[in-house]
Amino acid sequence: MAKYLVIVESPAKVKTIKKFLGANYEVMASQGHVRDLPKSQLGFDPEHDYEPKFITIRGKGDLLASLRKEVKKADKIYLATDPDREGEAISWHLYYALKLESKKVYRITFNEITKNAVKESLKNAREIDMNLVDAQQARRMLDRMVGYRISPLLWAKIKRGLSAGRVQSVALRIICDREDEINAFIPEEYWSLDVNLKVKGEKKPICAKYYGTTEKKQGITSKEQADSIMDSLNGAKFEVKEVRHGERVKKAPLPFTTSTLQQEASKVLNFSTQKTMRLAQQLYEGVDIKGEGTVGLITYLRTDSTRVSEEAETQAAEFIDVHYGEKYKTAAATEKKNSQKIQDAHEAIRPTDLNRMPIAIKEQLPRDLFRLYQLIWKRFVASRMSAAQYDTTSVKIQAKDQIFTLAASRMRFDGFMSVYTQEDDKEEENVLGGNLDENSVLEFQSFDPKQHFTQPPAHYTEASLVRAMEELGIGRPSTYAPTITTILARRYIAKENRNLYVTELGEVGNNMMKEAFPSIVDVNFTANMEALLDGVEEGTVKWKTIVSNFYPDLDEAVKKAEKDLAEVTIADEESDEVCELCGRRMVIKYGPHGRFLACPGFPECRNTKPYFEKIGVACPKCGKDIVMKKTKKGRKYYGCIDNPECDFMVWQKPSGEKCPRCGKLLLEKGNKLVCMDEQCGYVKNKPTEEK
């Protein structure tokens, strides 16, 4: 009979850990949380010191009964849930749900599921860390306060299936703010001017870029200015004024944190944050490897630390020495510096054993699991390697009073780039043809002027949103992926070609939250709340202080919104469309996916159809109405009502005015009207409305 009971979170770990520990240990899984706040009520009483009321999660009764049977048999119980706040809270709930007060109970944690790590954790068993538990409990209660109090209010007042969340509402606002920036952006014209010059004795010309005058750097803002510069240099002598040789190093990247893994997997592998975390969970919990059984391939996946254990540092140094050579090794990598709290009981995400090279286990892993493992393996090896080294040359060329420059680089030593390159590492070397000496004269061949327009800020992708959330202090490693998944699932945002767009539903929800609950969607407020939760974890802040300060203000805001938001209840709006089934005038209704037309004769008549909002502008192709439409994923655009017969379509709202230069439609962008033809580039201010 087993003398010791080990309780883990995931059933996927049970077999592996039991194999490590032997017959004296019984290993069972809690399958996540076993207790939570009740769904049907707030779950705590503000009048009684905010003490939470936890109940057994529906469906967990039989599991707890099985665990209690094993508890009775065991001399010692080891709570081995995940090594973070959530895991600590699950251990605490297990302690009370299983009534372990009279038993010998120990908390153990490990950052990787390997035999050494699991056995070492038994030697370092400790008590449950109540600071971690309190931090998780405070987060859970804050999230419950926002969701339970605000979501029903928005649903009742707006009638669109809206709901709110403490972190998700801020993430939505970040995306909405970017959308506003993009819509208000006015492109500005600028020009580049390259000159092709021939070096004496060389066949291939070199290309230098316009810099400015001998007095200052300057840009070119129009074709006329570019033409003027070229005309002024007609017959001019192009002379090399300065040649500088130097060196440049490109440092190795840091090993992955949760955030950087999600970003890189999105950019390189085109994985969603949710998919990345699902696959990383499998790699952490264990994969069947021929000859070894189930093996945990990476360390714990929810971390904001770049720290690496001494054992892993030693193995990396030895591995690099053997496979790449002494010169590829580097001193201990500089660790991530951050003013915010980093949960440094954790390590960076890394392979548990570098000798399990990706190519050696490729055939034993599904394709996407292999690709993610390879990415993590290469990134970690590269992070322990020396910098790449380049020889650089910069050249200044003068013609009359105008300056052109060129820069060239040649890789001298590849360092970490022999293993791993990121998107921004993939720069082509610009090698000078021949030697350039100061005061040498170059033969002019041609100018190459090009027109450009400034670009608006890019739409957020999942990767850049995660980066923004991390930089702003919104959420933590465990919340990035669930937050994005939630606002996508609720159709507040839509994803097209990796880009995230706000839907009409998202716009309405964000506007209402800004109006009624400005602090909830305030980035700084939310970041400060995260910092306070970190303070609870560190033992410097009491959890009840946070919730007791937060709830009264929220309660007051909800009561105020119940009065103020009453006026924005949306009544059915009558349309010009007549129901072809019963002859009634159809009304505009609102559903989870936006507006649609419905017959007011419901339930006798159940006719519905898509709603297209006419904007009062004629299609330039066929003369019929232009209407506002939505893509399948909810992004707004403007197209001909006669689609698919007519394919006219633009992303910005047509104004009805025509461009005085080219005759095409002018589109509304912020307080400007811009020509729909970017090559035309015409821009003017919107007419001021008369009061």
Which sequence ranges carry the predicted segments?
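Core structural elements
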Residues: 139-149, 167, 197, 248-260, ...
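Alpha-helical scaffold elements adjacent to nucleotide-binding pockets in ATP/GTP-utilizing enzyme cores
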Residues: 16-20, 66, 89-97, 117-121, ...
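Basic, low-complexity terminal or inter-domain segments flanking catalytic cores
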Residues: 2-4, 16, 25, 97, ...
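Conserved short loop/turn motifs at secondary-structure junctions
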Residues: 82-83, 159-163, 245-254, 266-269, ...
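Intrinsically disordered, low-complexity regulatory segments
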Residues: 1-137, 211-212, 220, 227, ...
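C-terminal or mid-to-C-terminal helical accessory/interaction module adjacent to the motor/catalytic core
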Residues: 113-195, 245-246
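Metal- or metallocofactor-binding catalytic centers and their adjacent structured scaffolds
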Residues: 215-254, 440
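Short acidic, hydrophobic short linear motifs in intrinsically disordered regions
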Residues: 240-243, 251-265, 292-301, 456-468
